[in-house]
Structure formats: C-alpha cells, structure tokens
C-alpha cells in the first residue's frame, strides 16, 4: 500500500471499494518504532480488511532498505535488521498475514559475497523462527538467477520463497525480466507489478515503460506462478502523480491493464 494515493486504513477501505482483493502492508520504520507492531493499529487494520473483503497478503519489513540484512550480525545495522524482522514475524502472526517480505535494496543491497553470506545467515534464522507461526519468509532482491538458486540452496528452508518484481531486475542491471521469471518461477510466492523508463523506478503505467512488462506478464500467465499480483507503481509521487489530477485514476488505468492482460472478469 506504500504507493497507493491514500494511506493507512483509509487507503485500505478505498482499495476495497475499487475492487482490490488483497493488499500488502508495511511494518513501518525503526525510527517510528514499527507502527504496525502496535496492537491497536493491528486491530484497526484487521477490522477494516474484514469489512472491505481485502486479504492482507504480506507484511513488508521496509526498514531493511536502511538497516539491511547484508550488514554483519554484530553491527548496529545488522542487529536492527534482525530485531525488526523478528518484530515483523510476530506482527504478521498476530494479524494472520501469511508472508513476511524482506527487501534487499539500498543499504541492504547484496553487492558482495560478504553481503550474500550475511543476508543468508539472517534469513535462515528468520525462516526457522517463522516455522512456529506457519509464515513464509520471502526475499525481494535483484540477484542473478545463479545467485538466487545458490541462496535457496544455502538457506535450505521450505518456508523460504521469492517476492518477484516486474521492474527491479531490469532497473538494477538491465536483465530480461521475463527470462529471469521463466527460470525462477517455481520459487515465486507473490509478484510486485510496476513499470518505468529512463532508468527511473515506477515512472510509467503498466505496459508503457521500457521494462517489457507485457512479456513478463505473458510468463506469469503461462506459469501461474504467483498466489498474488500486487500493484506497486508509486501513484502517490512524481512522476506518476503529475500525469493526472486524481491519482486514483492512474490506479484504475493499471487495474484495467491487468484485467485485460490476465483476462480477468
């Protein structure tokens, strides 16, 4: 919901009125003491999601983009990364959210072998802890196919999966996203859908950017690899919110594209 024009439970209610069936929410930042970990906030989200008929599909531990899993376990950032992720697991368990997403971007990007080892070490621990809750731990990253398979082999947990993204691989290193998905689809749990151009994240409506979204969508259809398809275009900020006076119209446009591409009624 972080790119949706309306925020919080108001955004959840609006999404329900627009016809969305599910939504991924965020744990919130370390600096704000992880707002979604507050039981009153959790109760409000659960009540609204039930009223609107929206499934809470995943909880993103977004602070990992500032305090990454790639940092050593005994470093300040590494400790914050692990602590916040554990709070994410507890929060998801209380809210009956089946997936906790662990992003590896910005400060948490996996660029070196040490980054890789540090990230795998923490994810393996979190997967073991998530088993008691019946929760899936999903990594979102831009590793190569080879390194992604190596990560799955090293972590070796049945509840470890991949949160795929339709733009990030192309944005990070110009990869053929459709081909990456063809090779990794057995490991995919959910998929973020966004597009862009000129090397800018989420800067185009679906199918109008340079990431060959329609080719990726074709692979999604052929493999039926994801339990959920989640809109992740940033409708609430430039450049997308400059395209229309009402950003919700942009959301409706992408919804129409998805229904057409995936032949949804």
Residue positions per predicted region:
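A generic structural signal for short
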Residues: 1, 33-34, 76-77, 114-115, ...
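N-terminal pre-domain/capping segments
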Residues: 1-93, 149, 157, 186, ...
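Active-site-proximal loop/turn and secondary-structure-junction residues that shape catalytic pockets
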Residues: 3, 27-29, 62-65, 104-108, ...
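Histidine-acidic metal/acid-base catalytic patches
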Residues: 5-19, 148-160, 164, 170-265
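Active-site acidic/histidine proton-transfer and metal-coordination neighborhood
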Residues: 8-11, 50-52, 66-161, 171, ...
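Hydrophobic faces of well-ordered beta-strands that scaffold small-molecule active sites
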Residues: 23-25, 56-61, 100-102, 137-139, ...
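A short acidic, helix-capping loop that chelates divalent metal ions and anchors anionic groups
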Residues: 30-33, 65-72, 106-112, 170-172, ...
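Charged helix-capping and loop-helix junction motifs
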Residues: 37-43, 78, 82-85, 113-123, ...
